[in-house]
Amino acid sequence: MDNIEKILEKQELRYVLGTAVSGKPMYLKKKLQKIEYSFTTNITDATKAHSSKIARMMLNNYIQDTGDTESELVIIPLVISYELVKIL
């Protein structure tokens, strides 16, 4: 990666819902078209919210839709970084 020039870097704050009840980190993934939830170990696949308020709404909707109060979901802040690079 010696021949790469960084042109632009951007960071965004996002929020995911996660739990470690199973003994390993799991993140909530929701299909937008349906009321269908699943858990994933891959944080890049997790559903991300643009604000903590929206993440709280997602958490409340999950509990209301599924009745699951034992997953112990928490809101996790996440910084996502992007770099635009030029290959020299």
Features from the language model and the residues they span:
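Short, mixed-charge low-complexity intrinsically disordered segments
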Residues: T47-L88
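A short linear-motif detector with a strong N-terminal bias
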Residues: K6-I7, P25-L28, S52-R56
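Low-complexity, intrinsically disordered regions enriched in charged/polar residues
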Residues: M1-D2, K10-Q11, S22, S52-K53
